[in-house]
């Protein structure tokens, strides 16, 4: 960012972008604050005897993900190249691999096009198909999972929680890692692809936090 002329800046991210944003917040003193829409933290074991309703739902979501929704992650983190050959060879296979996540992770009431337009869905698929990056994008999991750093983050942080997000965390769970959590909001609609699903709401969340810094 300094090479672009920004001596101070804010950063925002979700999914892998949340990991990158967190890294910026911990490794670059010029990053003054971070906002996340998928902050990954472990449940605080000290809260297990007095869980809130939200925390109970979050734990149920973790369990569902591990049992039914994490097959893609296990494949990409162990045998990404094997998967890549099939996806690079089949546009239908590539589309199915991507679009299933829009079905599962958007606030779509059973149909992805209720949350994201068909053109946007196909554009997302084409990013992988035209660039032939099914394998290399999958390898990100294989290359990164062993390097995950769950250490303390002292940078001022804001977190927005969407109901159809993959991982959700309560405010007190987040504060165990993000020790300067200044903004926490649980929204009524939206999912994992918040910027595509609810762009106005997404922008408002980012502005609401950074405006306070």
Language model region names:
Residues 76-213:
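C-terminal subdomain of alpha/beta-hydrolase-fold enzymes, centered on the catalytic histidine
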Residues 49-80, 150-152:
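The feature captures the conserved acid-bearing segment of alpha/beta-hydrolase catalytic domains
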Residues 41-65, 161, 167-174:
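Membrane-interacting alpha-helical segments
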